[in-house]
Every structure is written in structure tokens, then in C-alpha cells.
């Protein structure tokens, strides 16, 4: 693992320690895993591919509806909350319990993104 990927993984682990986020990963817009703090029972390749696909669809929907640049995509399931937040050429995907406080999670995710941007340069 590269030094940058290791630093990003540390940021993701910190996000999970300091918030209700239970899993997180940084994925390229092309669907490649850049850094992961996903649990071992989660298929990283599938998550990376689906994250890229969801981000692409979200951007197309935003464009079609003329709603501006996509900020984040939130999927609310019965058991989990999934938040995708795009950086310039990557997407941070985070999972949390369905009853988690979305405002606080959003705040913590944005703080992690600021740190990741510093690592990526």
C-alpha cells in the first residue's frame, strides 16, 4: 500500500472511531478502490464499481434536472444509511446505522474529506 493510501486509510479509520460511520472507502470515479476501511465481509471491488456507477448516474440526474453540481447522494435503507460524497476525482462512500444523525455524519464526513484533500494534494 502506498504512503498516501495508508494516510487516507488512517483518516477513514479515524472517521469511524469518531462518528457513527461504520464502514468507509475512497473510490476513484473510474471505480478503483483507492483506500478502504471496509469490514472484511464486504466485497471491495463490488463497492468500488457500484460507487462509480451511482456517482455517474447521480451526475446525469443532476444535469438533466438542472440542479447544479452533485453534492452528495444519500441512500436510506432499512438497516443502513449510505452516503456518497464526491471529491474532485474520487468519491468517499460511508455507511452508518439507519437511525444515525445525518447532520452530524455529514459534518464528520466533510472534515474527513478536507483531510483527504490535503493528502491527495
Where are these regions (language model features)?
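Acidic, low-complexity cytosolic segments
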Residues: 1-23, 30-121
